Structure formats: structure tokens, C-alpha cells
């Protein structure tokens, strides 16, 4: 006789975490008439078990949320920490001068490091939350199985008692029938006649048969009464003890899971609030301190005027050794009196000329003019080589670095100004280094006879100016360029690299992240069009389309990855083009739909001989895929299963689909590996709704 299991001996009540705090008032909901009638029926066990499974699924999803949130916080914290540390080192190494702006930026980078540390702390706490919820889920799952096993044991005991009762009733009815037949034979024994070779039974034989039938019927009746009594007792215990017991255990487990979920989510909300508050106080504390001043207070300490003064003083000290020996602010330039002879220009005063030292290094040549030009250096201590006319070189092409000769020259003093001015005024070509060739020509009457000289290579000229020069006008630049024997080399523009597609050849997870969906839009559009207009199309995915239509449809998706296909007119009524585009998309993924590090699992699963074991191996390999790949291959497999259901019309069996899609989903595989993977595709299609849940 079965009895109700006690809480100390039955495995149906394992230790709970958190402890069960279900009070008697909580069980009042079980006393409602409709609820009590349903739970005490045969449906009660299945309903309560499904309820607990739903809660456990929610618990598992919550643990997954905590885990993924911790991963995001870890990535965010590490990236922010790396970024802040990098720029903190940059500002500390490059900005040596004590400036308030640099100090404020450094303080802000330190604050960002604190924010990164907060994110890492939050990540550790969330990871601990996830581990705790997963551990609780495992314990609750064990308790659910234990309660279910106990409940099924009691239900099966009752069903077994009822079945034994029915069998005993059948045996009693059979024995009763035999007894009645034996009694009838005894009563009609005197009138029996010989039939064939068999003699009629005697009265003694008929009496013996009657006694045996009566004894058998009495035993069957006794067994039937005992089985009926046993079934009644088992039913009474089930309805009064066992069934209410496991209903309460299921209900208590449900309350326990509810309490755990609410408590953990409440801890999560408090953690988010505290982390947000901590970040806010770090960014803007209520009472700024030297160690925690906040971003706003750090920016308030910026003083642009003080920074400018400190920078100028610091720069003056830094450039003390590299200052110009001729300071325009400390040099007094006197305009000497000059006489330009008779003519209309007599009595006029030339504008002041910026003191300029020109050093022209001539290239020795036997054809060079032996008559030296008047030296522009009045100082006799400096040897004046034969310099050609300075107008033959363009000052704009002077190199940036001076020649060694220029470093030994000194600018003209006030005593030498007359000589240099008169020499420069007597030669109009040296009066201004910025004048153009056309403006420097003297009047026709004053020009000397032309002297034919051979063409010399360009002469390098080094010019040291003691004051700021004004850029030459565009006309002068153009004229000098025209006179120059050199021409700029025309450089053909480099062809621009083709624009990288954001869809074809990209990573699957990047596409899904960019589109904010679980499945790429192009996959959704292509599969929906094939299911709506191509299920009955013979040779779908096997018969190719024209490349022009496929390329046109491809360009449309490249220009707009979120393109929507509504009617067959959007792709010229060619469903084969849509099917080809879908295969091209999966074939050109940067990483195949089955990643390289998972391909071996699928290939090994296809090599398993037993079909049920091969299905289990494929199921395990599918569950190990990343989320993006799992959702996409799930959608594709359900789509191919729909294609296979119409194989009588479209002639695309499971084997045909596997042969076509095997090389498309994986890459860099040998022929035997592709053959094994094709068997894996067949398992996916045939057992689609066993491996995947159909939503």
C-alpha cells in the first residue's frame, strides 16, 4: 500500500535556495473551485510541470541577460580605460608647460579612468549575479524533476491498480461464463445423443466440470473484489494525500522561483542605480575636492590669458639660443640721401628698402662671364666671388636652408648703408628681390648692348632677410614660372579603390548589429519571396537565373540593405534571381555561415553512422554556434524544410538541397568533408522541427 512520502525521506523536497517562505495564506488560491477541479484532475500534473518549466526558462534567460550585460560592461570599461590612459599619456608627455587647459584635460582623463573602473566593478557584480542565477536554476530544475518523478510514480500506481482491477473483472466474467456453460451441459446431459465418433459425457464428468468451473469463478470473484478494494484505496490515497502533496510542492517551487527572480532583479536595479549615482558623483560631485573635482569644476579652472602669458614666456626661454641675430625691433634703419642724376626722377625719394643679404653661389664654367658684377658686400673683409646677376634666379625657389657661406656673412651696418643703397639704386635689378622681370627692366636708352651667353644650369640662391617679405604678386610668379627651364611633372591621379560593400562580403554579426535584427534583411526578403512565389517552381535553387538580373538585384541591396521586396515585379518576375542572390550572399560572407572553428563539429556529426546519434551530434553542434549564426541558420533550415515539403512539385528533395547548399554554407573544405556536411544538412532539414522550435 502506497503512502504519502514524508519530507525527510522523499527526494521530492531537496533543499531550496532561497529558503521556501510559502505561508498557508499563499495556498488559498489552490482552493478556488475551478482551479482545484483542474489541478485535481489528470491534467494537473502536466499543467503544473509546464508552469515550472516556464519559470525556469525565464530564470535562464535572466541569467543570460546578466551575463551579456556584464560582457558589454567589461568591453566598455576596458575600451574606455585604454582610451583614457592613452590620451592621458599623450597629454602628459607633449604638454610640458604648466597650462590650465592641459591640467583640466588631464583631470578629465583621470575622471574617465574612474568611470572605466566603475564599469569593470559593475561587470564583476553582474557576472556574479549571473552565476548565482544559473546555480539556482540548476537546483530548481533538479527539484522539479524530483517532484515530477514522485507525482508520476503515484499517478502510475493508481493507473496500475485500475488496470489490475479491470483485468480481474475480465477474468471473473470469463469464469462466470464457463460455470454457466457447465451448468447448462449438466442439465441437458440426459437428452444428449451421440454425435459422430464422440460419445456424450457422463453425469459424473459433467458434475466434475461444474465443480471446477464454480471453483474458478469463486476464485476470480474473490480476486476481483480484492483488486477493486485495492484500487479504491490507491485512488483515495492519491486524491487525499499524494496529489495535494505534489500540487503544494509544485506551487511552493513556483513561489520560490518567483521570489528568487524578483530578488535578483531587485538587486540588479539597485546595482544600476548605485552605479549611475556613482558615475554622476564622479562627473559632478556635490562638494568638489582636489582628488574629486568633477568635469565641470575642472573646466572652470581654465584661464586662457594666463595660459597665453605662460606659453610666451616659456617659448622665449626655449628659443633663446635660436633667435635671429638681427632683430628688426632693435635695428635702426636710416634712409641715406641719394642722387639719381638729371631727369624726371630727380628730387624723388625711393621708398625704404628692407635690408637683405643675398648669397648667390655660381656654378663654375669656362663659358662664364669673367667681368664680375658689382659686389653687394661693401665689407672688404669678405671675399666677393664673381656673382652673376641676381635677376637670373627666382627668389621664390631659394632653398630653405642657407649655405655655409651665408653663416659667415654679417648684415650691413649704418655706415655701409649708403654704399649698398647707391649700388642697389644704380642697378634696378637688385633694388627689390620681389619685383618681376618685366618691372626690373631699365629704359631702352639705358640698356647695355646684349651679350650672348650660353645657357647655364639653374643657379641656387640663398637669401637671408632681416625683415618680413611680402609674397610676390601672381603676375610675378607666373612670369618666373614661364621663364624657368623646368616644368612640373604631371602626375596622373591614382585610381580610387572600389567602395567596400556593407552587405556582400561583410561579417554576419556586423550586418545584424547594423540592421538591429536577428536575421539579415536580405535573407528575410529572399526567403519570403521564394516561399510566396517559388515553392511550386521546379528546380528552385538549382536552375540558375540570368546574371544581369542577379547583378541588378544585388546593386539594389548594396545601395539599400533594408530594401523591401513586395511583388514579383520588383525583380522582373524571376524568382530564380532571388534564389541565386541568396546563395551569393551566403557564399561571399567574410566568415561562412558555419564558422571555421565550428566546421569540424558539423563534419564529424555527418560521419556518424547511426541516424539518431547523428541527429544528436548535429543538435549539439547547432547549439554551440554564435547567436547570429544560430538564428540565421535556423531561419534558413526552416525555409529549406518548406521547400522540401513541396518536393513532389518542385523536384527538390532533401538530398538535392543538401548537395546545393553544402558548399555554399562552408568554405575551404575537401570533397569528402563536403559530402559529410551534406549529410548534416539532410539531418537539419529532415529533423528541422526537432532541432529547432517553430515560432
UniProtKB/Swiss-Prot annotation:
Q: Sorted alphabetically, which SMART domains does this protein's record hold? A: FCH, RhoGAP
Instruction: Please tell me whether the keyword Coiled coil is annotated for this protein.
Output: yes
Q: Which gene encodes it?
A: rga7
Q: Under the cellular component aspect of Gene Ontology, which terms does the record hold?
A: actin cortical patch; cell cortex; cell cortex of cell tip; cell division site; cell tip; cleavage furrow; cytoplasmic side of plasma membrane; cytosol
Give the start-end ranges of region Disordered. 1-26, 320-499
Q: Where is the F-BAR domain?
A: 33-307
Bias kind Polar residues: ranges = 336-348, 366-382
What Gene Ontology molecular function terms does this protein carry? Answer: GTPase activator activity
Q: Which InterPro entries match?
A: AH/BAR_dom_sf, F_BAR, FCH_dom, Rho-GAP, Rho_GTPase_activation_prot, RhoGAP_dom
Phosphoserine: which positions carry it?
496-497
Q: What are the Rho-GAP domain coordinates in residue numbering?
A: 506-692
Q: Where is this site: Arginine finger?
A: 542
Gene Ontology biological-process annotations: actin cytoskeleton organization; Golgi to plasma membrane protein transport; mitotic division septum assembly; negative regulation of cell integrity MAPK cascade; positive regulation of mitotic division septum assembly; small GTPase-mediated signal transduction
The answer on whether this UniProt entry bears the keyword Disulfide bond reads no
Q: Which PROSITE patterns match?
A: F_BAR, RHOGAP
Compositional bias of type Low complexity: which residue ranges?
1-11, 383-432, 458-467, 488-499
Question: What are the alphabetically sorted keywords of the record?
Answer: Coiled coil, GTPase activation, Phosphoprotein
User: Which region is the signal sequence?
Assistant: none
Q: What is this protein called?
A: Probable Rho-GTPase-activating protein 7
Q: Which domain of life is it from?
A: Eukaryota
Residue ranges crossing the lipid bilayer per the database entry: none
Amino acid at each position: 500500500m502506497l503512502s504519502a512520502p514524508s519530507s525527510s525521506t522523499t527526494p521530492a523536497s531537496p533543499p531550496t535556495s532561497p529558503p521556501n517562505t510559502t505561508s498557508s495564506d499563499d495556498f488559498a488560491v489552490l482552493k478556488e473551485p475551478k482551479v482545484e477541479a483542474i489541478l485535481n484532475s489528470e491534467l494537473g500534473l502536466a499543467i503544473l510541470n509546464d508552469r515550472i518549466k516556464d519559470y525556469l526558462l525565464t530564470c535562464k534567460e535572466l541569467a543570460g541577460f546578466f551575463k551579456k550585460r556584464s560582457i558589454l560592461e567589461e568591453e566598455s570599461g576596458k575600451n574606455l580605460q585604454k582610451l583614457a590612459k592613452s590620451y592621458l599619456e599623450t597629454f602628459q608627455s607633449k604638454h610640458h608647460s604648466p597650462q590650465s587647459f592641459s591640467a583640466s584635460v588631464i583631470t578629465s582623463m583621470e575622471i574617465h579612468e574612474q568611470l572605466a573602473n566603475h564599469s569593470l566593478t559593475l561587470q564583476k557584480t553582474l557576472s556574479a549575479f549571473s552565476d548565482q542565477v544559473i546555480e539556482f536554476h540548476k537546483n530548481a530544475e533538479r527539484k522539479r524533476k524530483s517532484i515530477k518523478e514522485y507525482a508520476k510514480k503515484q499517478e502510475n500506481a493508481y493507473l496500475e491498480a485500475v488496470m489490475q482491477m479491470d483485468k480481474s473483472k475480465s477474468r471473473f466474467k470469463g469464469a462466470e461464463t464457463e460455470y454457466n456453460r457447465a451448468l447448462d451441459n449438466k442439465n441437458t446431459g440426459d437428452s444428449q445423443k451421440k454425435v459422430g465418433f464422440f460419445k456424450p459425457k457422463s453425469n459424473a464428468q459433467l458434475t466434475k466440470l461444474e465443480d471446477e468451473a464454480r471453483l474458478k469463478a469463486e476464485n476470480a470473484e474473490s480476486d476481483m473484489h480484492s483488486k477493486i478494494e485495492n484500487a479504491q484505496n490507491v485512488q483515495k490515497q492519491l486524491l487525499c494525500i499524494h496529489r495535494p502533496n505534489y500540487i503544494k510542492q509544485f506551487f511552493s517551487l513556483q513561489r520560490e522561483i518567483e521570489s528568487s527572480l524578483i530578488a535578483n532583479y531587485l538587486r540588479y536595479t539597485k546595482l544600476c542605480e548605485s552605479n549611475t549615482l556613482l558615475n554622476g558623483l564622479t562627473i559632478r560631485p556635490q562638494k568638489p575636492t582636489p582628488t574629486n573635482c568633477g568635469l565641470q569644476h575642472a573646466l572652470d579652472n581654465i584661464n586662457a590669458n594666463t595660459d597665453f602669458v605662460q606659453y610666451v614666456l616659456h617659448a622665449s626661454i626655449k628659443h633663446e639660443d635660436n633667435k635671429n641675430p638681427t632683430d628688426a625691433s632693435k635695428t635702426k634703419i636710416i634712409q641715406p640721401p641719394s642722387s639719381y642724376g638729371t631727369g624726371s626722377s630727380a628730387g624723388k625719394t625711393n621708398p625704404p628698402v628692407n635690408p637683405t643679404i643675398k648669397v648667390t653661389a655660381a656654378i663654375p664654367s669656362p663659358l662664364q662671364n669673367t667681368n664680375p658684377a658689382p659686389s653687394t658686400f661693401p665689407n672688404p673683409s669678405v671675399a666677393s666671388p664673381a656673382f652673376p646677376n641676381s635677376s637670373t634666379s627666382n627668389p621664390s625657389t631659394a632653398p630653405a636652408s642657407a649655405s655655409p657661406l651665408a653663416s659667415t656673412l654679417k648684415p650691413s651696418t649704418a655706415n655701409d648703408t649708403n654704399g649698398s643703397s647707391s649700388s642697389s639704386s644704380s642697378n634696378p635689378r637688385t633694388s627689390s628681390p620681389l619685383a618681376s622681370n618685366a618691372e626690373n627692366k631699365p629704359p631702352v636708352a639705358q640698356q647695355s648692348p646684349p651679350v650672348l651667353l650660353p645657357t647655364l644650369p639653374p643657379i641656387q640662391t640663398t637669401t637671408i632677410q632681416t625683415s618680413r617679405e611680402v609674397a610676390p604678386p601672381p603676375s610675378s610668379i607666373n612670369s618666373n614660372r614661364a621663364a624657368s627651364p623646368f616644368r612640373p611633372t604631371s602626375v596622373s591621379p591614382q585610381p580610387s579603390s572600389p567602395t567596400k560593400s556593407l552587405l556582400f562580403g561583410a561579417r554576419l554579426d556586423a550586418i545584424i548589429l547594423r540592421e538591429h535584427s536577428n536575421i539579415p534583411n536580405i535573407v528575410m526578403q529572399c526567403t519570403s519571396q521564394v516561399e510566396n512565389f517559388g515553392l511550386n517552381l521546379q528546380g528552385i535553387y538549382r536552375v540558375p537565373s540570368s546574371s544581369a538580373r542577379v547583378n541588378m538585384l544585388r546593386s539594389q541591396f548594396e545601395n539599400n540593405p533594408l530594401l523591401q521586396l513586395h511583388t514579383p515585379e520588383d525583380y522582373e518576375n524571376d524568382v530564380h534571381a532571388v534564389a541565386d542572390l541568396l546563395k551569393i550572399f551566403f557564399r561571399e560572407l567574410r566568415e561562412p555561415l558555419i564558422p571555421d572553428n565550428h566546421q569540424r563539429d558539423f563534419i564529424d556529426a555527418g560521419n556518424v553512422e547511426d541516424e539518431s546519434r547523428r541527429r544528436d551530434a548535429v543538435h549539439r553542434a547547432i547549439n554551440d554556434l554564435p547567436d547570429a549564426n544560430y538564428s540565421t541558420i535556423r531561419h534558413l533550415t526552416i525555409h529549406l524544410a518548406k521547400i522540401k515539403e513541396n518536393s513532389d512539385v518542385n523536384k527538390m528533395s532533401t538530398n538535392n538541397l543538401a548537395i546545393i547548399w553544402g558548399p555554399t554554407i562552408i568554405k575551404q573544405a575537401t570533397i569528402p568533408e563536403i559530402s559529410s556536411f551534406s549529410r548534416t544538412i539532410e539531418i537539419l532539414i529532415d529533423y528541422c522541427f526537432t532541432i529547432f522550435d517553430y515560432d
